[in-house]
Amino acid sequence: MSLSDEQVQAEMHKMVSFIKQEALEKAKEIHTLSEEEFQVEKAKIVREQCDAIDQTYDMKLKRASMAQKIAKSNVLNKSRLEILNSKQKVIDDIFSRVEKKLDGIEQKKDAYTKFMADLIVQAMELLGEPVGIVYSRQRDAEIVKAAIPKATEVLKSKNGSIDYELDAETDDFLNDSVLGGVVLVGLGGKIRVDNTLRARLEIVKEEALPEIRRLLFGENPNRKFDN
């Protein structure tokens, strides 16, 4: 039996209503899934951002710690350098005073003449030659002339079989910065012995420096070598 128009319309309305309901439920399902995916994605992004922030913080913390260590090390090194410079200034001042006391030593003529004779003898013994040219400061020229005979006499008393020849250089003089003393030259200038007060002071400075440091500043527990 065929349906009436009213029945057909009613069935159509039911179908439309069913389709709408299905569509609504599907839309709701899609919305729910989208919301869940959104929340999952959002949580993922938040977690990644938090991890990135943590990594950045750790990196900056490490850099800050390293910078602090470097700054501390620089300060310590600077302090040590300043202390070392201060100590060196004290030592330099001591030897500077010694140099000032040596200035004008030639004025004590008798004592200086004997001292110069001793220096010439020492230099000749180191030279190992019977013939030597004695170089000195110009201000010491007269004292050297007086000291050479004394030195020759001492040398002959030690080695009577050797004929020593000592001459003072009268044209080419040593610089006043040598503080005094002599330079002996032998074998036509091939051998040279520096027995000036400057050279002797440098030797004393090198040998006495560890003891001077101990006297001035005490023992250094960190120093392994005495130099």
UniProtKB/Swiss-Prot annotation:
Primary residence: membrane
A GO cellular component entry from the record: fungal-type vacuole membrane
Subcellular location: Vacuole membrane
Membrane protein topology class: Peripheral membrane protein
UniProt record, GO biological process: vacuolar acidification
Keywords noted in UniProt: Hydrogen ion transport, Ion transport, Membrane, Transport, Vacuole
Top-level taxon: Eukaryota
A single GO molecular function term of this UniProt record: proton-transporting ATPase activity, rotational mechanism
InterPro entries registered for this protein in UniProt: ATPase_E_C (IPR038495), ATPase_V1_Esu (IPR002842)
Subunit (UniProt): V-ATPase is a heteromultimeric enzyme composed of a peripheral catalytic V1 complex (components A to H) attached to an integral membrane V0 proton pore complex (components: a, c, c', c'', d, e, f and VOA1).
Family the UniProt entry places it in: Belongs to the V-ATPase E subunit family.
Function: Subunit of the V1 complex of vacuolar(H+)-ATPase (V-ATPase), a multisubunit enzyme composed of a peripheral complex (V1) that hydrolyzes ATP and a membrane integral complex (V0) that translocates protons. V-ATPase is responsible for acidifying and maintaining the pH of intracellular compartments.
Name of protein: V-type proton ATPase subunit E
Organism name: Schizosaccharomyces pombe (strain 972 / ATCC 24843)
